[in-house]
Amino acid sequence: MEIKKFNDLSKILENKIPKSILKRDFFTSIIGTSPSKGARSPILWNSCYKKFNLNAEMIPMDVSLKNLPKLMSLLKDIDSFQGGSCTVPHKEKILKYIK
C-alpha cells in the first residue's frame, strides 16, 4: 500500500492503524463503530495467517457512519485490501458499497 493511501485511511478512522500493513502482501479488516475495543476476529485471523506463513494482517477499523462512504471508496482503490467483516450498525449500511 502506498503511504498516501495509508495516510488517507488514518484521517477518517477513529483508531490508529498499524504501519505494518504497509509491508504486507495483503490485509483484511473488521469494520465497525469500535471493533478495536474488543473484536476477536483479528486475533483469530492473524494467528491463521502466521500459521500458514502468509504475509498478511487483519486490522480493526473504527469508523463513523458518516465516514463509511469515504472508507469504502478508499478501500476499493487499495490493491492489498482483500476484504473482511463488518459489525452492526454498519452491517446493513455497507451492503450498498459491495459489488
Identify what each model region corresponds to.
Residues 1-20:
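Short N-terminal or domain-adjacent regulatory/targeting segments
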Residues 23-99:
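Phosphate/diphosphate ligand-binding glycine-rich loop within oxidoreductases
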